[in-house]
């Protein structure tokens, strides 16, 4: 059993990470910053300078911003935030946009000078918007986390100023307490009332958007394409996860519970585990514990990687889902550890080239590797310590992945952004 302080810490991590968001979180962060700019300035800016970090540009460029009439990109995210955003709603800042607002977005874009630049910054997530209106100006800056305002100013009067660091974990729960053994123990023994409000809502919201992704045409329809070829349980688990991303990346307005700042990761960590559990006849409480395990394994991996990087986050969530499914299949700590290491050995290095329709296919691939990772273990086959980036044990391997992503792939990130913006 875990002590009370560790149970409280793990519960707090889930409460902090499993947040409800409408739309891909990077354009939503831009819209949130824009809504706050309008609030500070006292009206809609007539001119805007947007200073945006490369990783935000990458993740906003190709994804459809919900409630904008199918528009994509930084300008659309700024415009919807200015015209109709509710800053108090944070990650649901554009959840209540009306049809009249959608029409007003184009009018605002046509009449407003919006200039976008990409300055050097120590923060991978960095959004600074400066606006001018009727002789006044204001500035709002969000950094490190999607709703973390570190600076606000109007007409030279500083309203808020926090230190700028490049650490996305600043002011968040200490995640150094996470380890695979304790995650499993927590998932197996935590009182269900501790996790039902967060993980239960995650299952409800994320399976709903996955169903929408299968019922209607969204993006490249990866989910429904997978189901055309097979109906076995593994394909269904992959397809349902991919379908949620099909819808989310292509402008579906249904909210999603995120993990590590990402809706795709929130979907991937939960939906395939839920689907497998349902197909195998597991009860709802058991599925809740399995998704909890998947979430925490995903968060544990992502702590070293960072919220935004050149390393595809859906891969980490796919590995987490594989571990959750392995637990439902009877795996203990040894089996789950080998599942993670086997999967990481297969798929590490998959790049993030921005939020877009093809994320759904990467999700399917990540979940597939997670499932295969346990199948290998169950058959007595495992990759060994020292095979590539695999460490002496699972915690060592997770650290290696963090170093690979946060340090080794920095130049990869710059090259991806250069290709995307040329």
Go through the PLM ranges and name each one:
Residues 109-251, 416-422:
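Signature of multi-pass transmembrane helix bundles
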Residues 44-48, 89-94, 116-117, 193-199, ...:
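Flexible, glycine/charged-enriched surface loops at secondary-structure junctions
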Residues 20-36, 254-271, 312-316:
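Conserved phosphate/anionic-ligand binding catalytic regions in large, soluble enzymes, centered on
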Residues 10-19, 56-65, 247-258, 298-308, ...:
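Glycine/charged-rich beta-loop-alpha catalytic/anionic-binding loops adjacent to active sites
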């Amino acid at each position: 059993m875990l002590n009370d302080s560790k149970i409280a810490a793990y519960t707090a991590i889930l409460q902090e990470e499993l947040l409800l968001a409408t739309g891909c979180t990077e354009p939503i962060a831009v819209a949130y910053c824009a809504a706050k700019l309008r609030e500070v300035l006292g009206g809609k800016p007539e001119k805007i300078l947007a200073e945006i970090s490369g990783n935000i540009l990458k993740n906003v460029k190709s994804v459809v911003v919900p409630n904008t009439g199918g528009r994509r990109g930084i300008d659309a995210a700024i415009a919807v935030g200015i015209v109709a955003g509710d800053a108090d709603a944070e990650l649901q800042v554009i959840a209540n946009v009306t049809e009249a607002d959608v029409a007003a977005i184009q009018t605002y874009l046509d009449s407003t000078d919006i200039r976008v630049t990409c300055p050097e910054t120590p923060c991978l997530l960095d959004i600074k918007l400066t606006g001018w209106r009727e002789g006044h100006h204001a500035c709002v800056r969000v950094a490190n986390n999607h709703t973390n305002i570190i600076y606000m100013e109007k007409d030279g009067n500083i309203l808020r100023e926090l230190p700028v660091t490049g650490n996305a974990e600043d002011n968040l729960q200490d995640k150094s307490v996470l380890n695979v053994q304790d995650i499993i123990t927590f998932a197996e023994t935590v009182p269900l009332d501790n996790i039902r409000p967060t993980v239960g809502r995650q299952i409800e919201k994320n399976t709903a958007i996955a169903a929408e992704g299968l019922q209607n045409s969204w993006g490249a329809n990866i989910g429904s394409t997978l189901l055309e070829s097979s109906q076995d349980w593994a394909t269904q688990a992959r397809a349902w996860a991919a379908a949620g991303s099909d819808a989310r990346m292509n402008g579906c307005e249904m909210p999603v519970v995120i993990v590590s700042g990402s809706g795709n990761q929130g979907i991937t960590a939960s939906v395939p585990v839920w689907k497998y559990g349902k197909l195998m006849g597991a009860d709802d409480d058991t599925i809740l514990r399995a998704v909890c395990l998947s979430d925490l394994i995903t968060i544990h991996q992502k702590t070293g990687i960072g919220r935004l990087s050149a390393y595809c986050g859906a891969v980490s969530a796919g590995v987490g889902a594989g571990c959750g499914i392995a637990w439902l299949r009877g795996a203990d700590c040894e089996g789950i550890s080998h599942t993670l290491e086997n999967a990481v050995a297969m798929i590490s290095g998959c790049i993030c080239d921005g939020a877009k329709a093809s994320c759904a296919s990467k999700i399917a691939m990540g979940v597939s590797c997670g499932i295969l990772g346990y199948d290998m273990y169950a058959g007595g086959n495992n990759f060994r310590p020292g095979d590539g980036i695999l460490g002496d044990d699972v915690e060592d391997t997770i650290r290696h992945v963090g170093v690979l992503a946060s340090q080794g792939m920095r130049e990869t990130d710059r090259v991806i952004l250069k290709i995307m913006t040329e």
